[in-house]
């Protein structure tokens, strides 16, 4: 049994890629007896959370007997799953809708931007239907309206238990909740996706088990607010495999860590109970990797953002975490040019970077998001100043990142292979999340395959990536684990 394969096409406006369907050869794709005239094109934009929504829609389309195509010309209808978080993402989404309309003419829009139907209709009045984010049933209902459900034999067009995936076979995103209870002034996600709505722990663990049984070697846990998982459950316990499981992020992470795959946590809000996750990393249950967006370091700006404002406590926490788990890799994101940000505020941010010594850092220039409170709370910063601060920020962090990566030189590490080309293999260590962090290059090793987990000694580094050589299995006992 085979299904279509999806490959990333990197965008320039987002940290995560658009996903489009790549055609597989006729002899490698089993479409069963899906009738022609029932082909659906699909474009997925935005973050990994949106990617999971796309996977769910695509899975149901295949279950219903539709064929998914990579060609606008061959599609009877095109679905565009949009992002609407920042202006650049909105522009990209509207461009994708425009292209689909020009190339095909029959388009359904869903996703975060779909929550702003009037904005889409003003630009693209010919769109057939518009739904908001995680509106799976509504999307399928609209598809059935314009392209009737085909007659098909479900036994000849089987779908894996894991469903259709837009990621390579060896890693997958696992979304554990929807929405967010925080009200950061620069963000409109709660308005688009609602308040926190956690999945039951049993459901999450069932999905994770299916992924691992299907060969997934890395599970990337995502949500709008991962560390808040279960807060909305009121302390209720769920059950999995007949065992009670507390519905909080620490208990969930502990159970995920027992499944034998890498477990990587993303989008961790800096709640006090994040401390409880670090021992799990030190024990090796989950990867020693913490994606914790801090956004700024000026107490004044953090207060305006409605974010935790005790930077001294954050620095103390980072030191405490590293003492418990010395291998810990911390990734964060920050905003420069937030309304009202002074040069003094920005210098506080640079000072924080120099003291915190974070491993992986992303930086965004503040973008006015329609409906965000932050747009009107203080004077907007000019584009010239934002650009200058962005480059100064990245220059400081590049030096820090180079220093942090250099500590791996000489170490032997597990490397998960993502790709192999004529020059060798490209993989990632525990320190590297796919698509947003660096890579590990193993030159000359063209016989490796994606999904392999190999041992390699790190030979050198720069501010982004590592280079390595495979370790002789016979010498494994002589090298550092």
Curated annotation (Swiss-Prot):
Q: Which Pfam families match?
A: Radical_SAM (PF04055), TRAM_2 (PF18693), UPF0004 (PF00919)
HAMAP family reported in the protein's UniProt record: MTTase_RimO (MF_01865)
Function, as annotated, reads:
Catalyzes the methylthiolation of an aspartic acid residue of ribosomal protein uS12.
Species lineage:
Bacteria, Pseudomonadati, Pseudomonadota, Gammaproteobacteria, Alteromonadales
- Residues bound to [4Fe-4S] cluster 1: 47, 83, 112
Q: State its location(s).
A: Cytoplasm
What this protein is called in its record is Ribosomal protein uS12 methylthiotransferase RimO
Q: What is its EC number?
A: 2.8.4.4
Gene that encodes the chain: rimO
**Note on how the cofactor is bound:** Binds 2 [4Fe-4S] clusters. One cluster is coordinated with 3 cysteines and an exchangeable S-adenosyl-L-methionine.
Q: Which residues bind [4Fe-4S] cluster 2?
A: 180, 184, 187
Keyword DNA repair included in the entry's annotation: no
Q: Provide GO CC annotations from the record.
A: cytosol
Q: Which GO terms describe its biological process?
A: tRNA modification
**Which EC class is the enzyme in?**
transferase
PROSITE patterns in the record: MTTASE_N, MTTASE_RADICAL, RADICAL_SAM, TRAM
């Amino acid at each position: 049994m085979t299904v279509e394969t999806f490959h990333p096409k990197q965008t320039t406006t987002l940290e995560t890629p658009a996903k489009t369907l790549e055609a597989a050869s006729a002899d490698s794709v089993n479409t069963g007896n899906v009738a022609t005239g029932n082909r659906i094109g699909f474009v997925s934009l935005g973050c990994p959370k949106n990617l999971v929504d796309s996977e769910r829609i695509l899975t149901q389309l295949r279950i219903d007997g539709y064929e998914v195509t990579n060609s606008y010309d061959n599609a009877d209808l095109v679905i565009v799953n949009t992002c609407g978080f920042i202006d650049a993402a909105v522009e990209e989404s509207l461009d994708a809708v425009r292209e689909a309309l020009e190339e095909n003419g029959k388009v359904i829009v869903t996703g975060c931007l779909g929550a702003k139907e009037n904005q889409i209709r003003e630009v693209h009045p010919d769109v057939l239907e518009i739904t908001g984010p995680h509106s799976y049933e509504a999307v399928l209902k609209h598809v059935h309206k314009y392209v009737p459900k085909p007659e098909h034999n479900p036994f000849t067009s089987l779908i894996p238990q894991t469903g259709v995936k837009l990621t390579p076979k060896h890693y997958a995103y696992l979304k554990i909740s929807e929405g967010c209870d925080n009200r950061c002034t620069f963000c409109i996600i709660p308005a688009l996706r609602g308040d926190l709505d956690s999945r039951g722990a049993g459901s999450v663990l069932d999905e994770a088990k299916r992924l691992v049984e299907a060969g997934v070697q890395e599970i990337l846990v995502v949500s709008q607010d991962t560390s808040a998982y279960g807060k909305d459950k009121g302390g209720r316990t769920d059950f999995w495999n007949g065992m009670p499981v507390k519905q909080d992020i620490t208990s969930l992470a502990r159970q995920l860590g027992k499944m034998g795959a890498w477990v990587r946590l993303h989008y961790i809000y800096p709640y006090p109970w994040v401390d409880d996750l670090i021992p799990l990393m030190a024990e090796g249950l989950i990867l020693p990797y913490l994606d914790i967006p801090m956004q700024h370091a000026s107490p004044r700006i953090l207060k305006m953002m409605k974010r935790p404002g005790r930077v001294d406590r954050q620095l103390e926490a980072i030191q405490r975490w590293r003492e418990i788990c010395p291998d810990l890799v911390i990734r964060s994101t920050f905003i420069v040019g937030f309304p009202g940000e002074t040069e003094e505020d920005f210098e506080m941010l640079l000072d924080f970077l120099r003291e915190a010594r974070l491993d992986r850092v992303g930086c965004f220039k503040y973008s006015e998001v329609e409906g965000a409170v932050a747009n009107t709370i203080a004077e907007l910063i000019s584009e010239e100043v934002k650009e200058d601060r962005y480059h100064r920020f990245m220059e400081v962090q590049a030096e820090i990142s180079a220093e942090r990566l250099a500590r791996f030189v000489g170490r032997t590490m597990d490397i998960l292979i993502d790709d192999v080309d004529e020059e060798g293999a490209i993989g990632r260590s525990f320190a590297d999340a796919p698509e947003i962090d660096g890579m590990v290059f193993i030159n000359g090793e063209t016989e490796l395959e994606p999904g392999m987990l190999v041992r390699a000694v790190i030979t050198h580094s720069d501010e982004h990536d590592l280079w390595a050589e495979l370790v002789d299995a016979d010498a494994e006992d002589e090298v550092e684990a």
